[in-house]
Amino acid sequence: MIGRLRGIILEKQPPIVLLETGGVGYEVHMPMTCFYELPEAGQEAIVFTHFVVREDAQLLYGFNNKQERTLFKELIKTNGVGPKLALAILSGMSAQQFVNAVEREELGALVKLPGIGKKTAERLIVEMKDRFKGLHGDLFTPAVDLVLTSPASPGSEDAEQEAVAALVALGYKPQEASRMVSKIARPDASSETLIRDALRAAL
């Protein structure tokens, strides 16, 4: 089981980061809320990982701290929620925002997330709220020293295309993703900024 990686970022293609550790490059799928905090390519980063084995693939999901990983593990225990949907949930909301939405039973906020209908949202509230009772209140308080960060890079010519592709990977339909990015697009924005703004606007 791979639980933690420390290495150099070779490439960032939302929501995937390619991290080199010991001469091996690992593709790590990350929620956009975690992806935003990564340093730029060529710099060192630490990610806490969860390894998922499927019939057709072996996937690594990465997080900036153990608390976010814990929430991801709890999410995929929920009936009808797989790793891809859990990734989309934690891309649309931070771990703390999700915990707050569940504890306050904010159904409206949850159904705005990609792939979450009313029934799934209700199930999340019932199942996750019960699990939170057995966890410490500060479990999902973000750690401050687990990843090295740096300012975001300037926008590129294909920033909008990258943003649309990332939203599609998170579960949005292509037309919907394009519309979301078009609403908030601006020439100087990086793909990460566009994705973050698009997700915020959707909520």
From Swiss-Prot:
Region feature (Domain II): 65-142
Pfam families hit by this protein: HHH_5, RuvA_C, RuvA_N
Residue ranges of the region described as Domain III: 155-203
Keyword DNA repair attributed: yes
GO CC terms of this entry: cytoplasm; Holliday junction helicase complex; Holliday junction resolvase complex
Span list, region Domain I: 1-64
Database matches in InterPro entries: DNA_helicase_Holl-junc_RuvA_I (IPR013849), Hlx-hairpin-Hlx_DNA-bd_motif (IPR003583), NA-bd_OB-fold (IPR012340), RuvA (IPR000085), RuvA_2-like (IPR010994), RuvA_C (IPR011114), RuvA_C_sf (IPR036267)
Superkingdom of the source species: Bacteria
GO biological process, one term: DNA recombination
Keyword DNA repair appears in the UniProt entry: yes
Gene Ontology molecular function: ATP binding; four-way junction DNA binding; four-way junction helicase activity
Cellular location(s): Cytoplasm
UniProt region (Flexible linker), positions on chain: 143-154
Keywords for this protein: Cytoplasm, DNA damage, DNA recombination, DNA repair, DNA-binding
Domain notes: Has three domains with a flexible linker between the domains II and III and assumes an 'L' shape. Domain III is highly mobile and contacts RuvB.
Task performed by this protein: The RuvA-RuvB-RuvC complex processes Holliday junction (HJ) DNA during genetic recombination and DNA repair, while the RuvA-RuvB complex plays an important role in the rescue of blocked DNA replication forks via replication fork reversal (RFR). RuvA specifically binds to HJ cruciform DNA, conferring on it an open structure. The RuvB hexamer acts as an ATP-dependent pump, pulling dsDNA into and through the RuvAB complex. HJ branch migration allows RuvC to scan DNA until it finds its consensus sequence, where it cleaves and resolves the cruciform DNA.
Similarity comment: family membership: Belongs to the RuvA family.
Subunit description: Homotetramer. Forms an RuvA(8)-RuvB(12)-Holliday junction (HJ) complex. HJ DNA is sandwiched between 2 RuvA tetramers; dsDNA enters through RuvA and exits via RuvB. An RuvB hexamer assembles on each DNA strand where it exits the tetramer. Each RuvB hexamer is contacted by two RuvA subunits (via domain III) on 2 adjacent RuvB subunits; this complex drives branch migration. In the full resolvosome a probable DNA-RuvA(4)-RuvB(12)-RuvC(2) complex forms which resolves the HJ.
NCBIfam families: ruvA
Record HAMAP family: DNA_HJ_migration_RuvA
UniProt-recorded name of the protein: Holliday junction branch migration complex subunit RuvA
Organism per entry: Salmonella schwarzengrund (strain CVM19633)
